[in-house]
Amino acid sequence: DFFFQGLNTPR
C-alpha cells in the first residue's frame, strides 16, 4: 500500500 499500490502486497 506504499510502493506496490497496484499489487497491494503485505510485504
Swiss-Prot record:
Q: Does the keyword Glycosyltransferase apply?
A: no
Record's subcellular location: Secreted, Extracellular space, Apoplast
Keywords, ordered alphabetically: Apoplast, Manganese, Metal-binding, Secreted
- In which broad location class does this protein mainly occur, judging by the first location in its UniProt entry? secreted
The free-text function statement in the UniProt record for this protein reads:
May play a role in plant defense. Probably has no oxalate oxidase activity even if the active site is conserved.
- Quaternary structure, from the entry: Oligomer (believed to be a pentamer but probably hexamer).
What family does the Swiss-Prot or TrEMBL record give for this protein?
A: Belongs to the germin family.
What is the protein's given name?
Germin-like protein 4
> Organism source for this protein?
Betula pendula (European white birch)
